[in-house]
């Protein structure tokens, strides 16, 4: 669908391992897991119109990401914001949104 060449190509995020049709084991990329989950979501709609899909998916990924980052930085918001590549004020808003303040 789209080609996203970023610095993460060398170290893609994985969520586990999957067995291919020929029996080899390969890493399951987070990107593929999200794609599969969104496809399953649409398949289960049974003709209903989807609403706010972007926000739904973003919340499903962003909340656990923030939780892990905050644990990793032992609650240091400045370090967490730097690791995420966002402004500390933006991080504070996101933490508040998910009740992590």
From Swiss-Prot:
Pfam families noted in UniProt: HTH_8 (PF02954)
DNA-binding interval(s): 77-96
Classification via Gene3D superfamilies: Homeodomain-like
Domain of life: Bacteria
GO MF annotations, alphabetized: DNA-binding transcription factor activity; sequence-specific DNA binding
Key words, A-Z: Activator, DNA-binding, Transcription, Transcription regulation
Task performed by this protein: Activates ribosomal RNA transcription. Plays a direct role in upstream activation of rRNA promoters.
Subunit comment: Homodimer.
Cited NCBIfam families: PRK00430.1
Family: Belongs to the transcriptional regulatory Fis family.
Entries under HAMAP family matching the protein: DNA_binding_Fis
Protein name: DNA-binding protein Fis
Species of the source: Shewanella amazonensis (strain ATCC BAA-1098 / SB2B)
Gene name in the database record: fis
């Amino acid at each position: 669908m789209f080609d996203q060449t970023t610095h993460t190509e060398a170290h893609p995020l994985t969520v586990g391992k999957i067995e291919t049709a020929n029996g080899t084991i390969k890493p399951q990329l987070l990107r593929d897991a999200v794609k599969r989950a969104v496809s399953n979501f649409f398949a289960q709609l049974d003709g209903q119109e989807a609403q706010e899909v972007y926000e739904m998916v973003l919340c499903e990924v962003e909340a656990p990401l923030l939780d892990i980052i905050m644990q990793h930085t032992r609650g240091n918001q400045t370090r967490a914001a730097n690791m995420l590549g966002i402004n500390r004020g933006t991080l504070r808003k996101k933490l508040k949104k998910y009740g992590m303040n």
